[in-house]
Amino acid sequence: MGKALIIGCGGVASVAIHKCCQNSEAFEEICIASRTKSKCDALKEKLEGTTKTKIQTAQVDANNVDELIALIEKFNPDVVLNLALPYQDLTIRDACLATKTHYIDTANYEPEDTAKFEYKWQWAYREKFKEAGITALLGSGFDPGVTGVFSAYALKHEFDEINYIDILDCNGGDHGYPFATNFNPEINIREVSANGSYWEDGHWVETKPMEIKREYDFDGVGMKDMYLLHHEEIESLALNMPGIKRIRFFMTFGQSYLTHLKCLENVGMTSIEPIMYEGKEIVPLQFLKAVLPDPASLGPRTVGKTNIGCIFQGKKDGKEKKYYLYNICDHQECYKEVGSQAISYTTGVPAMIGAMLVMNGTWQKPGVYNIEEFDPDPFMDALNKWGLPWKESWDPALVD
């Protein structure tokens, strides 16, 4: 039994909070905190009476370290689950350090004025967290998150050495809009409009956005076009997987999405450079986010499935081997359970699991760690229990 402070009240946070309330044996009490307290109150009202978990709410500016410290000291949680924006990772980390509270997030830090995410800012906290005697668990979503757990599990149970990892993220869902993003539009568009990259033979290979395209036949979804992107777990897996030669990340996109994205880029709407408009400074991408559908509203209208997983190639007992670990998630089943589409569900469930494992001591050690640095077995068991069952194949089609 423990207490968790959950910062954020968007689509992913809503799922994680639902799952914490389903898991009241672990989460005795939670506090939902966001800049907009009314959203937290509405979620509390929806969940109270359905759970034994006690729910509090609070208003907090996640950019303000002093406010965060005051809230942590008032609520006194065992863990802080950061489901706010990636720009706010470091202020929340600083508050956890000041209060000696364990920290979990789902995405790595990204400066608001630079569309570039990497782990160096968070890894810089290693000694500070170690000295404070607290744990920071980085990237406890699906990708990053479950993909790292899958990698650790494959290395522990299936391989002596993993040489190649292809991470495949397929969303076969249809929300009916000409253009919408399945998670925070600002973060999503920054990610897909950046240069791609992959890790090969000890160094980064950079590509133009959407330059490398492949087709893959996904179980439960069918044949889809997918594109190579830069993704954060590549950076940590390159360090933590001994013998690794190449890691790539592919994500599926439909032609309508890509056409709209290119058009928006061409007219400057994906820019993060501030402009003056009627005497006020605005960021075009943030304005675009305001006019696009809220990802949290897509649940009731999204149909289809996701398929996210990792294809591994390596050696076992001196012989070449391949292995595929993946999860299939149904958008409408997610909506029936927690009122969300599957993109938020596949991130929110692992966020709850990571917080649970840190809180109950299973994954506790002082310092800053990526998810693949812990024993994967408890997490893999919890995925099956809490709504993200995984599948295996020992003869998958490979990506060229």
Regions found by a protein language model. Give the residues of each.
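Short beta-strand element of Class I
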Residues: E29-C31
